[in-house]
């Protein structure tokens, strides 16, 4: 491998005639990078292929230059060979970079999705308010019908006057109260539910994109190695060229000037790769939070829908019984007996719906808080800094 041959010859790499020796000194920092490059080549077939091509090019150009060094003269063909070699090496690196040219630090998909989430949850909060209003109306209806039953018990004890006037009055109030769930409630329910389902679909698509980006971290690691070894080989080639056309002091100046970018490029690329991974994982943390919150929201809305329908069925039955009692005053006793049978189920359903509604609205609020925490910390924060989602439920 190019890295292997470079590191093995690090103690005495010389080009030029005996009277004008040129030596490239590879310090411990380069040794570390080259060793890392060797390991990467053994683990990555694509990088190993790049290394083989680079090795072949480098040998060809150095052999070409060696003949010029012996006579202290370089032909235009030799210089053209050098230029073409450097261009080819750089082009190989550029090709790899362009394969994944997306701007990872400005993820417009994520930005749009987070905005959509907060717009959606704002509508969800409106829905929660409307749901609470409907529940209050249902509770008032439950109180009225319970009071009507109590009135019936009192009036039924008066054997001389069993017209059940107060009972009928309460039943009329119950009838006037009507259905607790309005058209606005169902319109909001449909809107929010569709938004939540759409959100889950978009989250699934974005998660797959982010998973692909995490897999591409291997590509970026390959790029960083390519950039480093390309710059390193460029120093070797330029040093040979300098040996053929200049005095040793000039060679030393050229090699020294190039040593800084070569030494720093490995660190820079590694920093780039690390930042890439951190940013993508930060984006995945945000997406995971939104997915959990949205999934729970959809499930709770399914439960709420079932319970709302159950309340509707129960109250519709009670309204029919009340209507029967009002129109057929002689049948008040029969109507109240039927109402009593339905009342307990109606009350339990309202209580159950209230519990689900409270949990749902609480979950939405907590989900917004968790996601805001992640956005504030993104991409520098750590998931450990936050309360786990399960603890906040």
Swiss-Prot record:
Region (Disordered) location: 1-20
Q: Provide the coiled-coil residue spans.
A: 149-222, 299-356
- Which ranges does the record mark as transmembrane? 226-246, 249-269
Q: Would you tell me the Gene Ontology cellular component terms?
A: membrane; peroxisome
| Keyword field contains Metal-binding | no
Its name, as the record gives it, is UPF0496 protein At2g18630
Organism of origin is Arabidopsis thaliana
Q: Which InterPro entries does this chain map to?
A: DUF677
Topology relative to the membrane, per the entry? Multi-pass membrane protein
Task: Provide the protein's localization.
Answer: Membrane
Is Transmembrane helix given among the entry's keywords?
A: yes
Q: Which family does it belong to?
A: Belongs to the UPF0496 family.
Main location as per UniProt: membrane
Which keywords label this protein? Coiled coil, Membrane, Transmembrane, Transmembrane helix
State the signal peptide span: none
